[in-house]
Amino acid sequence: MGLSLDIGCGAHKNPGTLGVDRRSLPGVAVVCDFEQGLPFLDGSVTAVYLHNIVAHMDDLVTFMEELYRICEPGAKVYVRTPYYASREAFVDPTHVRYITEATFEYFDYPNYYGLKTNFKIRSTYFKMRKPFKFMPAYFQKRFRRYLWNACIEMDIELEAVKPI
């Protein structure tokens, strides 16, 4: 069985995962600049948690290629990020990109623009503000796309598709 990583965990690592961060903090087992590579063997990881970290990535494409390298076939990647049309996306001055529900479709094609990734989007969940969260999904979709700050963040589950 492979590793379960929490990359960019800070001091709040998910239980049962190996903490990976740029800084040495409580719960962090591996200190590295994960945008410069990940110190794990090819195909050695079964699950990766990326909670509130992708908006900070200078080079998301290279990071996703590196992530794909270390994932075993079928590995799950759990992304949580501020929704691009939310206040939370703009409050943090260290955010360098804004993530939409379509961002990870870019990594969903093998050799798309020469990428070395094939992550399939398995699910997407949107955390809506009140009163929007009590509305039917059809209305939530419209409000999150066309109304500023209706959606706070989103969770995306990806799966690494590789030959076995």
Locate the predicted segments by residue.
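Conserved SAM-binding loop
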Residues: 2-85
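S-adenosyl-L-methionine-dependent methyltransferase catalytic module, highlighting the catalytic core
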Residues: 58-66, 72, 76-164
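Short, Lys/Arg-enriched, disordered terminal segments
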Residues: 1-2, 164
